[in-house]
């Protein structure tokens, strides 16, 4: 019995490395505009996870077939717009954000997606103004 449990665990561990783990994941966006009174927290989904990549350190000898660079990116995305509270009449209170409906492993489309990772400051401060939450619901 113990051997079958250990074998099953080992197979699951090995198989999980071969299966891409690229899925929509809950994420909170923080939007703060200078002219508005509040910082807004918007709950949405983004694509996040592991995708198989390979990069040879001998590109000249190996050629492009040994260069596979894929990331977790949008397959289907929906854009939603919210009205930011506390904005004066002269300011545009609309903010549009993406909601990942499905994801896949592939190359990032720089024409439509943000492909660069932006490092956070790490201090935990996300807003300098009072915080308001906006929750999205799937239609």
Curated annotation (Swiss-Prot):
Glycans are attached at residue 43. InterPro entries: Cystine-knot_cytokine, Glyco_hormone_CN, Gonadotropin_bsu, Gonadotropin_bsu_CS. One of its GO terms (molecular function) is hormone activity. Gene3D superfamilies: Cystine-knot cytokines. It comes from Salmo salar (Atlantic salmon). Keywords: Disulfide bond, Glycoprotein, Hormone, Secreted, Signal. Disulfide bonds join 22-72, 36-87, 39-127, 47-103, 51-105, 108-115. Residues 1-20 form the signal peptide. One of its GO terms (biological process) is G protein-coupled receptor signaling pathway. The gene is tshb. Heterodimer of a common alpha chain and a unique beta chain which confers biological specificity to thyrotropin, lutropin, follitropin and gonadotropin. It is found in: Secreted. Indispensable for the control of thyroid structure and metabolism. May play some role in the biological processes of the immature fishes. One of its GO terms (cellular component) is cytoplasm. This is Thyrotropin subunit beta. Belongs to the glycoprotein hormones subunit beta family.
């Amino acid at each position: 019995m113990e051997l079958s449990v250990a074998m099953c665990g080992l197979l699951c561990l090995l198989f999980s490395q071969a299966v891409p783990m690229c899925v929509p994941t809950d994420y909170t966006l923080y939007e703060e505009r200078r002219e508005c009174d509040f910082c807004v927290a918007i709950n949405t989904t983004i694509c996040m996870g592991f995708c198989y990549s390979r990069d040879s350190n001998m590109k000249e000898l190996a050629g492009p077939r040994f260069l596979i660079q894929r990331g977790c990116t949008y397959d289907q995305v929906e854009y939603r717009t919210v009205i930011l509270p506390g904005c004066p009449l002269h300011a545009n209170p609309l903010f549009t954000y993406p909601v990942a409906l499905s994801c896949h492993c592939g190359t990032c489309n720089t024409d439509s997606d943000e492909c660069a990772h932006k490092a956070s400051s790490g201090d935990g401060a996300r807003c300098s103004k009072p915080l308001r939450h906006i929750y999205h619901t799937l239609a």
